[in-house]
Design a protein with these regions (language model features):
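N-terminal strand-loop element at the rim of the active site
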Residues: 11, 26-77, 108
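A short, histidine- and acid-enriched strand-loop-helix "catalytic/donor-clamping" loop
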Residues: 12, 107-110, 124-142
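Extreme N-terminal starter segment of soluble prokaryotic enzymes
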Residues: 1-4
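Membrane-proximal helix-turn-helix segments that form the acceptor-binding/catalytic region
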Residues: 87-91, 133-154
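A short, glycine/small-residue-rich beta-strand->loop->alpha-helix junction that serves as a flexible
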Residues: 7-21
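Short N-terminal targeting/anchoring amphipathic segment
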Residues: 74-79, 88-110, 125-129
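Short hydrophobic segments within beta-strands
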Residues: 6-8, 37, 103-104, 129
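Alpha-helical membrane-targeting segments
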Residues: 64-87, 112, 143-150
Length: 154
């Protein structure tokens, strides 16, 4: 199977980079063909030796080194772009560019974005992975999961 990894978090290094590397290696070991779906001009920190397909919707948004006011503006921009990236990934799946999509880094905000995207009616399965949920976000997370139960490919 051709499995897309949708990555939109600009990461200097650390657990996201390592997690993606492990995911790619495991998919290859199981005989799958991983491909990355990423925002345009995405700054990879590691060469995963996979095909890359760029998503419509704008570049990835980073909060690194910005003021509180600018962060608020960027969070609105990131939300709008996240919906566009999800829509683009969904369309790529419908066009046969992958058999399934894994989204390895998520939050309750992503679940909110799903409800505002065409992804709820996706023809290909989307697997959203969550790790490191903050205790203060627990209820939002649980509510977000419940809100997506009616969508069979999410």
């Amino acid at each position: 199977m051709r499995i897309a990894i949708l990555e939109s978090i600009v990461m200097p290094a650390g657990h996201e980079v390592e997690f993606d590397r492990i995911l790619v290696e495991e998919l290859k070991k199981q005989g799958h063909e991983p491909v990355f779906f990423v925002p345009e001009r995405f700054p990879f920190k590691l060469d995963y030796h996979c095909d890359v397909d760029y998503l419509d919707g704008g570049e990835a948004v980073s909060y690194a080194g910005v003021s509180r006011l600018k962060r608020l503006w960027l969070s609105l921009q990131r939300e709008r772009r996240r919906i566009a990236w999800l829509n683009s990934a969904c369309q790529k799946g419908a066009d046969g560019k992958c058999d399934a999509v894994i989204v390895p880094t998520n939050s309750w905000r992503v679940m909110r974005s799903i409800r505002h995207s065409i992804l709820k009616d996706s023809k290909v399965p989307f697997l959203f992975m969550f790790h490191g949920i903050m205790p203060k976000d627990r209820q939002r997370f649980c509510d977000g999961v419940k809100s997506l139960k009616e969508y069979p490919n999410v």
